[in-house]
Amino acid sequence: MKTKSTCAQNPNCSIMIFRPTKEEFNDFDKYIAYMESQGAHRAGLAKVIPPKEWRARQSYDNISNILIATPLQQVVSGQAGVFTQYHKKKKGMTVGEYRELANSKKYQTPPHLDFEDLERKYWKNRLYESPIYGADVSGSLFDGKTQQWNVGHLGTIQDLLEQECGIVIEGVNTPYLYFGMWKTTFAWHTEDMDLYSINYLHFGQPKTWYAVPPEHGRRLERLARELFPGSSQGCQAFLRHKVALISPTVLKENGIPFGRITQEAGEFMVTFPYGYHAGFNHGFNCAEAINFATPRWIDYGKVASQCSCGEARVSFSMDAFVRILQPERYELWKRGQDQAVVDHTETMVSTSQELTTRRVTKAPRKTWGLKRLRLRQVSRSLLPIATVSNVPCNMQVCHTSRQPSDVKGDDVQKSDSARASPHPLSLPSSGHMSTRRCSLGRRPCELGAQESSNGAPVKRQLPAGRDDTSPSPELQPQAVSGDLIVDSGLVNPGPQHLMTASEGGLTSDP
């Protein structure tokens, strides 16, 4: 049985960095619970550096022929640190062709002294030379043998969405890949249904993230309504379109607390429920992202805002989650009398030291390896798509209308032709991949765990059964100086279970 307790940890809402041991890395749910017990969720974002023995994939040498079906050119308008980003669909290209483009003179990363210098160049030159983002490629690059933290097989309660309701939404409960270049961006947003997300940077140049603590999310929304009055009038939750860019300078000037951190290859970023985040890529790279859930998320899901204009709507019924995981509140929920109240400072802790979470029995889902990835030379004929019918619960099918992604931290809008999956091509590789992210009621808009013209990409819902991807020692927090957090990993981390709290990572006016 779980009890709630107010989390007094991390009162400054600093972005934390965790280094689990090999043993601690074995239980994903338990480690997320541990991170929250230390207050990581209060920042809305945390970094996890895997044990040195762990590998997501043995080699990335054979991915050049993967097809990025609908690259998105990110065009920006605006001034003084306040921009609107929209997307122009470009002709499909392979990862190898995209790499050459990203490293070309026109799009390559400019010379810079350090991450902070590159960040200044980003905001100074964002209006020029619109970059192209290879976002929302459905699938995974994790080896099938990778058990720990394989984003396609996290085994969290989000699996109820497919198991109980037969709902599969690309990018939500199946992974998306994001191929980035210098200046490709994910605009300010929270995850669909205010879920958690996890983003792994497989290889390439770093990615800088900004995050506003969940307890200050309403302040960011109010500022965004003032800065983008037209968009605000057209949609009650227009930030879900993932097109609004607000610079750190503007946030500081308006007293909005935020943190920033740079993710490097081989590192995970975890976003927490109702944690607004945004960011940009430093150069050619590849990230993989997916959403997940814990029991603490359920009350967030009940009250999550929804896009009211249909541009970026991804929603599903909370019925199965309440019925199975909050049975004592289910009858009230059905009558509309269950008033969910979210306290962003609280965390869910177990009465036992095990931090056990109700685990849903799950049959292993087949995953798409590179052999299932869409390749340039593969036939474009389509796989049959089954209808989602006779689902064993009240969960409504996700509404799919979404803008192109800017980042998941990554997202994008998709064409109808790109929404169908091709026949598999046999390749001697492990991992799993396809080409798009699906979501009901959402159109492409974001690139990071989220990007087509005039918005971000849309998530697609797939029928279930489809062959798709899909007690810790005390820590000694270590301060990292500077607003831009760079963790070299060269210093002895001290205790095995080291967490780093970023001093100065949270910024606001006094």
Curated annotation (Swiss-Prot):
Question: Its Gene Ontology biological processes?
Answer: cellular response to ionizing radiation; DNA damage response; double-strand break repair via homologous recombination; inflammatory response; positive regulation of double-strand break repair via nonhomologous end joining
The family classification in the record reads: Belongs to the JHDM3 histone demethylase family.
What does the entry's PTM section describe?
Answer: Ubiquitinated via 'Lys-63'-linked ubiquitin chains. Deubiquitinated by USP14 with the help of TRIM14 leading to stabilization.
Question: Which keywords has UniProt assigned to this entry?
Answer: ADP-ribosylation, Chromatin regulator, Dioxygenase, Iron, Metal-binding, Nucleus, Oxidoreductase, Transcription, Transcription regulation, Ubl conjugation, Zinc
Named cofactor requirement(s): Fe(2+)
Q: What does this protein do?
A: Histone demethylase that specifically demethylates 'Lys-9' of histone H3, thereby playing a central role in histone code. Does not demethylate histone H3 'Lys-4', H3 'Lys-27', H3 'Lys-36' nor H4 'Lys-20'. Demethylates both di- and trimethylated H3 'Lys-9' residue, while it has no activity on monomethylated residues. Demethylation of Lys residue generates formaldehyde and succinate.
List localization entries: Nucleus
Compositional bias of type Low complexity: which residue ranges? 418-433
Q: What is its EC number?
A: 1.14.11.66
- Locate the residues binding 2-oxoglutarate: 133, 199, 207, 242
Q: Which reaction does it catalyse?
A: N(6),N(6),N(6)-trimethyl-L-lysyl(9)-[histone H3] + 2 2-oxoglutarate + 2 O2 = N(6)-methyl-L-lysyl(9)-[histone H3] + 2 formaldehyde + 2 succinate + 2 CO2
Compositional bias segments (type: Basic and acidic residues): 405-417
Tell me how the cofactor is bound: Binds 1 Fe(2+) ion per subunit.
Q: Which InterPro entries match?
A: JmjC_dom, JmjN
**Where along this sequence does the record place binding of Zn(2+)?**
235, 241, 307, 309
Q: What is its main location?
A: nucleus
Domain of life from the UniProt record:
Eukaryota
Q: Which residues form the JmjC domain?
A: 143-309
Please state what the protein is called.
Lysine-specific demethylase 4D
Polar residues bias spans? 470-479
List residues, modification PolyADP-ribosyl glutamic acid. Answer: 23-24
